[in-house]
Amino acid sequence: MYSVCDVVRDAVAQSHLCACPNDKLPQCKGVTKAPPKCSVFHVAKLQDTKFKWKYTLDPLKAQKLSQIDKDIEKDAITLKLIYGIELSPEDLEWWKMQRCLINKKTGAKGGQFANKYLERQDLELLGYSPTPIIGGDFMFTALPDKVLRTIPVAWDRFLNPAMMIFFLIILLCVILGIFYVLVRNTLRRKQKSKQHQMEIKRFIKEKEQDPYIHTSFESWPADPNKKWKDLIPMYEAQGYCMADYRKKLGMPPGPNC
């Protein structure tokens, strides 16, 4: 029974013939047709194309996806006739197929497509290679294999230049959101601090006017009629009768009446 990796490695082993017939390629001499096993790469490339069309607003989106599904089905039938097993197209995606490749130098399983891995050059010439992780081949010459093998292969799908714009937009939105929250909270704290300071100033002002304010000895409010009450005895001293005024002001009866 064949596994997905068996099929992938089998296809990679003769991938140099997938561009045939092509008179410019020396390996294509006498080859009139690309091997059916190249269907593995066709499916992988179609899966990439399908992924891109899924997230487009193009009016032809539904029509294009339908055609891609039909093409994938044709290649899946071809592979079934060769290997006698039903392969899921979802298993034949570039980032999943990378798990099946082997490092030429060490024999260890390779995590990423790079020139040092099995037949990557042929795949690039055929246009089948996936978009490399950010940094491209430079990353693979600058970092040791042990480091490279720690990079999850799934990152090849998301950490590529074509997709990074979406992640940068999301990151920018997150940063702006955090900045907005910080600014809003700072302004709220300043507003509360300002209100608190105003309350303190008002309390100090009231305290200066009445030292017993807000205590059990708080002074009675000033009498608005005190001025007139002070004038009445003065008029009475001159012999006037101020009984009516005393009554209106709530004062006891006085002389001269």
UniProtKB/Swiss-Prot annotation:
The keyword Transmembrane applies. Keywords: Host membrane, Late protein, Membrane, Transmembrane, Transmembrane helix, Virion. It is found in: Host membrane; Virion. The keyword Transmembrane helix applies. One of its GO terms (cellular component) is membrane. It is a multi-pass membrane protein. It comes from the Viruses. Its main location: host cell. Induction: Expressed in the late phase of the viral replicative cycle. The chain crosses the membrane at residues 123-143, 163-183. Belongs to the asfivirus C257R family. This is Transmembrane protein C257L.
